Amino acid sequence: MKIVIADDHHVVRKGLRFFFATQDDIEVVGEAATGLEALRVIEETKPDLVLMDLSMPEMDGIQAIKKAIQQFPDTNIIVLTSYSDQEHVIPALQAGAKAYQLKDTEPEELVKTRQVHGGEYKLSTAIMPHVLTHMKNQHDPEKEKYYQLTRREKDVLTEIANGKSNKEIAAALFISEKTVKTHVSNLLAKLEVADRTQAALFAVKYNLNGEISK
């Protein structure tokens, strides 16, 4: 898996590069110190994942995410930042980030964010209250779609919002991975959302059964 690291701090970039060097299936193919440089490196290296800080010169991370998604729609971007406030979290997710992690995240959790490359979705538990508050404050014409889901589809949706992979959902619900995939496909269609990221945000909006990680 090819990764690009975009952060304006040299020490952070080198630290991440050193850490990922210990992972057999991860290769750091580029680094960037500014938002503009990140776009150039993404174009040159076509990485599977991009670790993006939000505070960078020339172009901040949020603008860089927007432009990267516009120019390279298949790009999977993981925000790695020290900001946990709503003013940064929500715009970053709306810009197209597939994961949002804080810089004090445990290394093992950071490695798990690679799952966004396979369609998974990862949010730091520290930012979930901000996401929930934002979604609750939005006008809600879509609520009826939730009630179209079966009980099992709701269970699967809750697990998606908690950042679990299909394999983990299957184990938690005692069903096969193939059955999980079927439920995911069905609930995406019923909710009229394009991917697991949007489904997870939908789940956070309704705080399903209080089971979503706070």
Swiss-Prot record:
GO BP annotation list: phosphorelay signal transduction system; regulation of DNA-templated transcription
Protein known as: Uncharacterized transcriptional regulatory protein YhcZ
GO molecular-function term, one example from the UniProt record: DNA binding
Keyword GTP-binding tagged: no
Main localisation: cytoplasm
Residue numbers bearing the 4-aspartylphosphate modification: D53
Keywords: Cytoplasm, DNA-binding, Phosphoprotein, Transcription, Transcription regulation, Two-component regulatory system
Annotated ranges, domain HTH luxR-type: 142-207
Superkingdom assignment: Bacteria
Residues within the DNA-binding region(s): 166-185
Disulphide-bonded residues: none
UniProt signal peptide: none
